[in-house]
């Protein structure tokens, strides 16, 4: 009888420890607005860089590899995020003007954006992973995807024809170390 009571006591202690640890280790459900830097390059190996204040995709070699722009990311939902460059001081946005939809860089601090403000929706992108690649759809302009041209040194833009093969909409997206 004494052995059973001792085992039961140890078992209860073990269970309390396990459940207590699980509660402490589990995320609280609050989203993190912490900015993280990522490397991005398209499936044709073109990386992003800035040329005349415009985001461009091309093949950087030699000393030019230092021109590569890291993408600053602030997650806002499980698959939605804000994208920026230059330490989050310039943000990518989807702007619709008449029939034209275009990608532009805006001088906005990425950490000042909020998923709850309607005017900030133009900065939000939906991330979709497919195997090793990722695509980014505009939250403000559904059906419009971040893309690069087939040719090098062309502006990063948006397309509403992701499967036509004219523009590249699949990217490798890796947290920068």
Swiss-Prot record:
Zinc-finger among keywords: no
Family in the record: Belongs to the IL-1 family.
Glycosylation sites: 109
Coiled coil: none
Tissues in which the UniProt entry reports expression: The intracellular form of IL1RN is predominantly expressed in epithelial cells.
Signal peptide span: 1-25
CDD domains: beta-trefoil_IL1RA
Free-text function comment from the UniProt entry: Anti-inflammatory antagonist of interleukin-1 family of proinflammatory cytokines such as interleukin-1beta/IL1B and interleukin-1alpha/IL1A. Protects from immune dysregulation and uncontrolled systemic inflammation triggered by IL1 for a range of innate stimulatory agents such as pathogens.
SMART domains linked: IL1
InterPro entries referenced in this protein's UniProt entry, alphabetically: IL-1_CS (IPR020877), IL-1_fam (IPR000975), IL-1RA/IL-36 (IPR003297), IL1/FGF (IPR008996)
Superkingdom per UniProt: Eukaryota
Example GO biological process: negative regulation of heterotypic cell-cell adhesion
Record: disease: Microvascular complications of diabetes 4: Pathological conditions that develop in numerous tissues and organs as a consequence of diabetes mellitus. They include diabetic retinopathy, diabetic nephropathy leading to end-stage renal disease, and diabetic neuropathy. Diabetic retinopathy remains the major cause of new-onset blindness among diabetic adults. It is characterized by vascular permeability and increased tissue ischemia and angiogenesis.
GO MF annotations, alphabetized: cytokine activity; interleukin-1 receptor antagonist activity; interleukin-1 receptor binding; interleukin-1 type I receptor antagonist activity; interleukin-1 type II receptor antagonist activity; interleukin-1, type I receptor binding; interleukin-1, type II receptor binding
Keyword Translocase: no
Any single Gene Ontology cellular-component annotation: plasma membrane
Highest classification ranks of the organism: Eukaryota, Metazoa, Chordata, Craniata, Vertebrata
Disulfide bonds: 91-141
Keywords: Cytoplasm, Disulfide bond, Glycoprotein, Pharmaceutical, Secreted, Signal
Pfam families, per database record: IL1
Identification of the protein by name: Interleukin-1 receptor antagonist protein
